Amino acid sequence: MNAHTGTVRGKERYRSGVMEYKRMGYWEPDYTPKDTDVIALFRVTPQEGVDPIEASAAVAGESSTATWTVVWTDRLTAAEKYRAKCHRVDPVPGTPGSYFAYIAYDLDLFEPGSIANLSASIIGNVFGFKPLKALRLEDMRFPVAYVKTFQGPATGIVVERERLDKFGRPLLGATVKPKLGLSGRNYGRVVYEALKGGLDFTKDDENINSQPFMHWRDRFLYCIEAVNRAQAASGEVKGTYLNITAGTMEDMYERAEFAKELGSCIVMIDLVIGYTAIQSMAKWARRNDMILHLHRAGHSTYTRQKSHGVSFRVIAKWMRLAGVDHIHAGTVVGKLEGDPNTTRGYYDVCREDFNPTKLEHGLFFDQSWASLNKMMPVASGGIHAGQMHQLLDLLGEDVVLQFGGGTIGHPMGIAAGAIANRVALEAMILARNEGRDYVHEGPEILAKAAQTCTPLKSALEVWKDVTFNYQSTDTPDFVPTALETV
């Protein structure tokens, strides 16, 4: 027995019966993670009376090689190598009864290039473990050797901007509203008006697929006609995210191929199709020179609560590995969940070549992306022209700002809504480039631009009092310096 950790060694471990996880080698406080280890950070909330170290060791065991009792077949494997090792447990600041558990996994435990296999190990079974009241996967670190087994984003931010010939500003988009019920012809009219008015993209919503009121093929035809007409009228490259999400991969490939035949530069999928389907469509997009947009439909069912589930920063990392080009990552100021610092962390994951540890953004590890392309984050949900200075300041320029209701809900019409957003953006970019303090002068800059733009003036008046000031449920908890081990 190891006197320091209480770990049972050698033949003693293989007595029949049940043994504590921390005595089976899943708790190794002296272990130093290797550069080639995958590291996961869990927020562990044990049941009353359960030792936090035992609970954390159980997470390590149940997400790697352990089961509920000693098994003799462990002696047929390199058990010391393949056991996940919980090497650090810290109390979560300000949250009594919860602990951050750092767990290292040998790289050989994972199939190269497979998010499905990775997630099956890390979150596949352990979240239902009875000794745990709650469990959340907060962050992960992937070694370069593992990152290089994935293709990464099919197109990337740089190539996307080159294809669109649009630089130095955020891209503008809008989700077609109402999301359900429009005929194909009327849907196409919305797309045309929005693009002609100055937007770069329009977008299908997550649940518009192929329903009785509008077959997918009709939608594709009318939308691409609208894109072509808007391009001819504006002289700019335009696009619309055609949602190819369907019930089978065969149907999705059929829709993607038809979108390509029509000349679309981008297709869209939903997160709910699953990790394998996402990777399959990312490979198709790369082979066919298409931009791949991912709507994070369904994510809040497991990302929103702080105590249980999977943090969206982990989903963002998985999706960058998987190969999507766009991902919805929050707005901070809109109607959807988004703590400012936490959201900045998501954007860091999307857009940086190397993520340094940044605890205030919820990033617990250094992460190299090994030359994988960058993802374009998308801000969507409850934003409008009057927030343009805040959006530019908080989110930067490599982002798609999607004003759905803020375009289609404009009192003067869809084209006027698009004009208002484009003029507001151009005014703010000009002010930034001139070196002005556009963050504090934002309302003044917008008011001046509105003097010569009636649609913007109307937008500022209609939505001047619209705010979504609610307390975020997912704020970063972090340990500024290493605390004493529990």
From Swiss-Prot:
It comes from Bradyrhizobium diazoefficiens (strain JCM 10833 / BCRC 13528 / IAM 13628 / NBRC 14792 / USDA 110). It comes from the Bacteria. The gene is cbbL. The basic functional RuBisCO is composed of a large chain homodimer in a 'head-to-tail' conformation. In form I RuBisCO this homodimer is arranged in a barrel-like tetramer with the small subunits forming a tetrameric 'cap' on each end of the 'barrel'. This is Ribulose bisphosphate carboxylase large chain. InterPro entries: RuBisCO (IPR033966), RuBisCo_large_chain_AS (IPR020878), RuBisCO_lsu_C (IPR000685), RuBisCO_lsu_C_sf (IPR036376), RuBisCO_lsu_fd_N (IPR017443), RuBisCO_lsu_N_sf (IPR036422), RuBisCO_lsuI (IPR020888). GO terms for biological process: reductive pentose-phosphate cycle. The keyword Ion transport does not apply. Mg(2+) binds at K203, D205, E206.
